Amino acid sequence: MGSKHNPPGNNRSRSTLSLLVVVGLCCFFYLLGAWQKSGFGKGDSIAMEITKQAQCTDIVTDLDFEPHHNTVKIPHKADPKPVSFKPCDVKLKDYTPCQEQDRAMKFPRENMIYRERHCPPDNEKLRCLVPAPKGYMTPFPWPKSRDYVHYANAPFKSLTVEKAGQNWVQFQGNVFKFPGGGTMFPQGADAYIEELASVIPIKDGSVRTALDTGCGVASWGAYMLKRNVLTMSFAPRDNHEAQVQFALERGVPAIIAVLGSILLPYPARAFDMAQCSRCLIPWTANEGTYLMEVDRVLRPGGYWVLSGPPINWKTWHKTWNRTKAELNAEQKRIEGIAESLCWEKKYEKGDIAIFRKKINDRSCDRSTPVDTCKRKDTDDVWYKEIETCVTPFPKVSNEEEVAGGKLKKFPERLFAVPPSISKGLINGVDEESYQEDINLWKKRVTGYKRINRLIGSTRYRNVMDMNAGLGGFAAALESPKSWVMNVIPTINKNTLSVVYERGLIGIYHDWCEGFSTYPRTYDFIHASGVFSLYQHSCKLEDILLETDRILRPEGIVIFRDEVDVLNDVRKIVDGMRWDTKLMDHEDGPLVPEKILVATKQYWVAGDDGNNSPSSSNSEEE
């Protein structure tokens, strides 16, 4: 009720003015926070604190179930207090659950079995938060991250000593510098790739997906990105500490893996090319089994590059401390296996040999018979043993047809109908539903960018989709500023062949186990339907702790699932030093599927989570 000195109209005007001022200040602080949140040190934490205090409700809103969700019944019961997860011991800061060193040494060394995945049983799983090392800082933005890594993030100097003469990595002040050298490219990765490009069509989009077996610090993959080629690099967790960790700190795709006794976690015909640059894989061992596995994942018409022993043995036999006869015999044996796989040697000069796989088996001229693999599903590879057999080409109707289907050049390949779909090989997916999936994920990613304006910038370089489906999320996000590891859960429909046919990369994985990577290697994780999928297979807590392990401090996770599932997820992550917001579906509050956005707080070993790292100035683009 207004007084004569303050009539009601004035009160309303002042209230409106006050509201506008508050909203204006709120938005100002939000934008200031976003601008400051360059991903480096105190800028991140200050911006997060400002945003937390201001809480602009017109930018990001919490769900209000009561007035809107009449069709979604939320049980009204007292929420149990969330479990607060404690930090793991600091010595576990680089813990990799399925490649843990003490456990690995209990397994045979034969065929590199001890370097393969050996995950802990349920009663030995860690249920604590893996800490970041003291001084941890958000990586430099791409492309600077290709050349520089903060020492505090991966404090391992062994490679600077062991590979000092090979220009792999140098230690300068408080950073590692990666000059782009390598054992087999002393003139730099660019010069090496240019030589390959004189034979292989690397620059025109014909080659989009590549495999680097035994990648070192992934300089080849890093410089292939300049040619718009995505390289899946892998190396074991071995004496060269942190090879894969360095690769991911640089913003280059990589996993911990080895060619050993089990099949690689990729579908058949996934890669346009593969290379071994002094990777030390014994290609002639076990009757050529490892080359047969490379052949399985290499597309018809694809290329295999071998640089290093035994190529150019006449020059290097003394350096390698091996006899001419031994090296000559090894090269002849490799070439014989290649012929049996229907590969043709296209080039040999200096330290490099290049082979090309025939486009189908009609032009094969094998001098010796080979055993073909009898398994019906060549993509059923999870924990399956490698066999000494050749994966047969898909059938063709004429000599000019590419077995398995010809792919368009990239980027047209990204949205073209993949052969697996046009041939009806993916149950329940046709050309129409594929196009619907494209449109759906374009819409959803646009919505994500409204939630967080830094999505699509260099702030989030390493991205993972935990349940990738047809690769729609990654395709909608496609940009030189980021790359996406598309994970196909082993208990879901097998669509990884579609992901690769679109010119994207990915891997099979079971989320009841640890992922084959180091801690703190992803900036942004997307989890659509993951927890509905796994809620009866293993503990959601274990999947979330693994998500926390591989997520960088101040990285984000976007969960998309049924609201009751997300409520269960939220109760767990509230005890994991994450900040969360539960939000409506893009199509409105009546849709039972919701979105949970989470940010991992910055904290390091030994502190209480309130400290910030030192600053490193840079801006996202």
Curated annotation (Swiss-Prot):
Residue intervals on the Lumenal side: 36-621
Highest taxon of the lineage: Eukaryota
Transmembrane segments: 15-35
Pfam (any one): Methyltransf_29
Example GO BP: methylation
Gene Ontology molecular functions: methyltransferase activity
Glycosylation sites: N321
GO CC, alphabetical: cytosol; endosome; Golgi apparatus; Golgi medial cisterna; Golgi membrane; plant-type cell wall; plant-type vacuole; trans-Golgi network
InterPro entries, per database record: Put_SAM_MeTrfase, SAM-dependent_MTases_sf
Parts of the chain on the Cytoplasmic side: 1-14
Membrane topology (UniProt): Single-pass type II membrane protein
Enzyme class, spelled out: transferase
Keywords assigned by UniProt, alphabetized: Glycoprotein, Golgi apparatus, Membrane, Methyltransferase, Signal-anchor, Transferase, Transmembrane, Transmembrane helix
Keyword field contains Transcription regulation: no
Location in the cell: Golgi apparatus membrane
EC number annotated for this UniProt entry: 2.1.1.-
Family of the protein in this entry: Belongs to the methyltransferase superfamily.
Protein name: Probable methyltransferase PMT14
Organism: Arabidopsis thaliana (Mouse-ear cress)
